[in-house]
């Protein structure tokens, strides 16, 4: 399995997202310019220029016409995917951490960090069909009990009825997307012991996977918030992804830059590790990055995956045929 090495960013990667068809890959990094690639051969198609801060997250609409990005420059932006034109800017008074389109693309959930006197918040915005009619009003604003803790990820639940969030306070919360009422939150006993860094939904929205600095990833039932599985690894987990094809999960991570030694690379600490989703056992690893892995994404067809690292590279891996026959 020879990776395709994609160099388009000057700074560490933060997020990767495929479109629904799996032919396009969007990457975000700390260098202000989200980038679009062909997901098949890694060819760079273009960049989206307009942010002046690290871009933490992005999402693409179902028909691949719109892109939404969230940045440390205190804005979230809507873009025309094809032309690269900036369609609208949502301005906040705090860095924007996470963005996610609802099913149907008429709503988006955006999280903002704690900043000066502003508490961390989850905002629901209406997305107009015609960019000319777009406004910045929030339909709903949610706050976690500890407003100083960052909300690293918020995504839509099944049928846009709920919003699932997780972050620095280690708690996963499920909110009613209409009323803003807190419906469920993860139990301290079974939940993560350190910051939740990443969250990835299954293709059918029935369950989701969270990654944490406590060196585990956990699989949860989307409706009941029951803990289903726990995957334990040797490094803090920065990124997680679920295979849409096989019962596999992939985890990526590594020490924070300040704690890294050159031996970590040789010790296999910067591998993307694959686990059997059901048996919770490690089935393999993919090396390559010279530093922690910050972003992971499976192609929607399940036949390839990409990883983004602190080293500024995106590595695109098309699986060999023997991957599909792994037996434990």
From Swiss-Prot:
GO terms for molecular function: translation initiation factor activity. Keywords: Cytoplasm, Initiation factor, Protein biosynthesis, Repeat, WD repeat. InterPro entries: eIF3i, G-protein_beta_WD-40_rep, WD40/YVTN_repeat-like_dom_sf, WD40_repeat_CS, WD40_repeat_dom_sf, WD40_rpt. GO terms for biological process: formation of cytoplasmic translation initiation complex. Component of the eukaryotic translation initiation factor 3 (eIF-3) complex, which is involved in protein synthesis of a specialized repertoire of mRNAs and, together with other initiation factors, stimulates binding of mRNA and methionyl-tRNAi to the 40S ribosome. The eIF-3 complex specifically targets and initiates translation of a subset of mRNAs involved in cell proliferation. Belongs to the eIF-3 subunit I family. This is Eukaryotic translation initiation factor 3 subunit I. It comes from Arabidopsis thaliana (Mouse-ear cress).
């Amino acid at each position: 399995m020879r990776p395709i090495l994609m160099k388009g960013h000057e700074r560490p990667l933060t997020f990767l997202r495929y479109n629904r068809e799996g032919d396009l890959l969007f990457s975000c990094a700390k260098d202000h310019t989200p980038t679009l690639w062909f997901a098949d051969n890694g060819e760079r198609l273009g960049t989206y220029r307009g942010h002046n801060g690290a871009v933490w997250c992005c999402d693409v609409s179902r028909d691949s016409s719109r892109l939404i990005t969230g940045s440390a420059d205190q804005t979230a932006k809507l873009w025309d995917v094809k032309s690269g034109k900036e369609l609208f800017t949502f301005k906040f008074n705090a860095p924007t951490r996470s963005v996610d389109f609802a099913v149907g693309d008429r709503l988006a959930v955006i999280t903002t960090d704690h900043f000066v006197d502003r508490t961390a918040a989850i905002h629901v915005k209406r997305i107009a069909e015609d960019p000319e009619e777009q406004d910045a009003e929030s339909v709903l604003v949610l706050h976690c009990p500890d407003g100083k803790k960052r909300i690293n990820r918020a995504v839509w639940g099944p049928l846009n009825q709920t919003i699932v969030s997780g972050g620095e306070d280690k708690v996963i919360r499920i909110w009613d997307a209409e009323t803003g009422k807190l419906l469920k939150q993860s139990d301290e006993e079974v939940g993560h012991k350190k910051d939740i860094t990443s969250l990835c939904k299954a293709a059918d929205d029935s369950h989701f996977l969270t990654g944490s600095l406590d060196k585990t990833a956990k699989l949860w039932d989307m409706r009941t918030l029951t803990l289903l599985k726990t995957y334990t690894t040797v490094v803090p987990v920065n990124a997680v992804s679920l295979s849409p094809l096989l019962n596999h999960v992939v985890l990526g991570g590594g020490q924070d830059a300040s704690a890294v030694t050159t031996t970590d690379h040789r010790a296999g600490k910067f591998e993307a590790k694959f686990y059997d989703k059901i048996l919770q056992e490690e089935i393999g690893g993919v090396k390559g990055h010279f530093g922690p892995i910050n972003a992971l994404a499976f192609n929607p067809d399940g036949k390839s995956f990409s990883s983004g690292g602190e080293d500024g590279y995106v590595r695109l891996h098309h699986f060999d045929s023997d991957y599909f026959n792994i037996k434990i």
